[in-house]
């Protein structure tokens, strides 16, 4: 199995409901190590840059507005097949379709405010990690 890194965001809705600790617990219980983490409030420019691939989609404006509506937590997770592992922990994008016991099933209210974001592939994880973290901010855990 491959040790990978993936990128994760705890979105404004989950931060506002004080679910940060519970979500971090899900990551760690699943064997993922948090090797970088910070809380920030995205500017409009940061949100537009991060979600640039969706700029022509009809939901782009609402997405940017939501992602700038309050603080978020961004983190880098490391572990065996981290991208897939995190996607399984998150559950389906639409919480109504998410399996019981997943983050979105337990903490999200709607497809628009669905608690978390996670990279969909190793390549996107690398790009997303670099958007928010310098190499010096990553703290590989050997113990």
Swiss-Prot record:
Binding of ATP, residues: 11, 59, 87, 93, 104, 114
EC identifiers of the protein: 2.7.4.6
Any matching Pfam family: NDK
Record localization: Cytoplasm
GO biological process, one term: CTP biosynthetic process
Co-factor requirement: Mg(2+)
Chemical reaction(s) catalysed: a 2'-deoxyribonucleoside 5'-diphosphate + ATP = a 2'-deoxyribonucleoside 5'-triphosphate + ADP; a ribonucleoside 5'-diphosphate + ATP = a ribonucleoside 5'-triphosphate + ADP
Listed GO MF terms: ATP binding; metal ion binding; nucleoside diphosphate kinase activity
Domain of life: Bacteria
Active site per database record: 117 (pros-phosphohistidine intermediate)
Keyword Kinase: yes
InterPro entries attached to this UniProt entry: NDK-like_dom, NDK-like_dom_sf, Nucleoside_diP_kinase, Nucleoside_diP_kinase_AS
Main localization, broad class: cytoplasm
Keyword vocabulary terms for this entry: ATP-binding, Cytoplasm, Kinase, Magnesium, Metal-binding, Nucleotide metabolism, Nucleotide-binding, Phosphoprotein, Transferase
Any one cellular-component term (Gene Ontology): cytoplasm
HAMAP family from the UniProt entry: NDP_kinase (MF_00451)
Protein family (similarity comment): Belongs to the NDK family.
Subunit structure, interactors included: Homotetramer.
Function: Major role in the synthesis of nucleoside triphosphates other than ATP. The ATP gamma phosphate is transferred to the NDP beta phosphate via a ping-pong mechanism, using a phosphorylated active-site intermediate.
Name this polypeptide is given: Nucleoside diphosphate kinase
Species annotation: Shewanella sediminis (strain HAW-EB3)
Taxon lineage: Bacteria, Pseudomonadati, Pseudomonadota, Gammaproteobacteria, Alteromonadales
């Amino acid at each position: 199995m491959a040790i990978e890194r993936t990128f994760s965001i705890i979105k404004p809705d989950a931060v506002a409901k004080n679910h940060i600790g519970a979500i971090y617990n899900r990551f760690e219980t699943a064997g993922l190590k948090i090797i970088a983490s910070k809380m920030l409030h995205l500017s409009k420019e940061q949100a537009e840059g991060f979600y640039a691939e969706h700029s022509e989609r009809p939901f782009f404006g609402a997405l940017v507005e939501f992602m700038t509506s309050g603080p978020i937590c961004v983190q880098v997770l490391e572990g065996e097949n981290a991208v897939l592992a995190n996607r399984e922990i998150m559950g389906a994008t639409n919480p109504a379709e998410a399996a019981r016991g997943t983050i979105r099933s337990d903490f999200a209210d709607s497809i628009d405010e669905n608690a978390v974001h996670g990279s969909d592939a190793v390549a996107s994880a690398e790009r997303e990690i670099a958007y928010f973290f310098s190499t010096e901010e990553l703290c590989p855990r050997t113990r």
